Amino acid sequence: HYSSRRQRQMCIRDRKGGSSREKWMKNDKPVLPGRLNDLRHIIYKSADTQWRQAKNNMGLMLKEGLLKENIDGEALKWAFNKMNKRKEDRKILMVISDGAPVDDSTLSTNTSDYLETNLKKTVKWIESKSNIELLAIGIGHDVTRYYNRAVKITDVHDLGDAMINQL
């Protein structure tokens, strides 16, 4: 539900690459431009927030229309950089995925495996070069081709149990 026509137009524009794609088009559409979509990082629960305070936010992951483009590799790098600055001895980065990374603007202007390759390189680096534990849960999709420590669930209602079991 959008409260104004402008919000509706902005949402549609964002799903088509946003200002990144507009800039690319104004610059004569260079070949193989890399990521061609604006980024939006949504934090459902920060490390400092108690679970009971963030419980309602977790349900937003299931909101239809909120997430249309998934640039997983860059989102993972962003989360890693934030987490890497923290002081805790044990750090766990949990990915909840609906499958493969997808961004129509990027995939239509680069190689078809561009986003998957970026994700695989990012995961490999985090898993081999850092002390951050990387866990993944695929909802309806097997994500073990990307993550070493991953499980698949078929029903979103199993998410809570899967999260606890992964820890």
Residue ranges and their predicted role:
Residues 63-70, 74-81, 99-146, 153-154:
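VWA/integrin I-like adhesion module and closely mimicked acidic/polar interface patches used
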Residues 81-89:
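Surface-exposed acidic, glycine-flexible loop patches that form ligand/cofactor-binding
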Residues 149-167:
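C-terminal helix of von Willebrand factor
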Residues 90-94:
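Structural motif
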Residues 1-14:
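Single conserved hydrophobic/aromatic residue that forms the stacking wall/gate
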Residues 15-23, 104-107, 145-148:
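A short acidic (Asp/Glu
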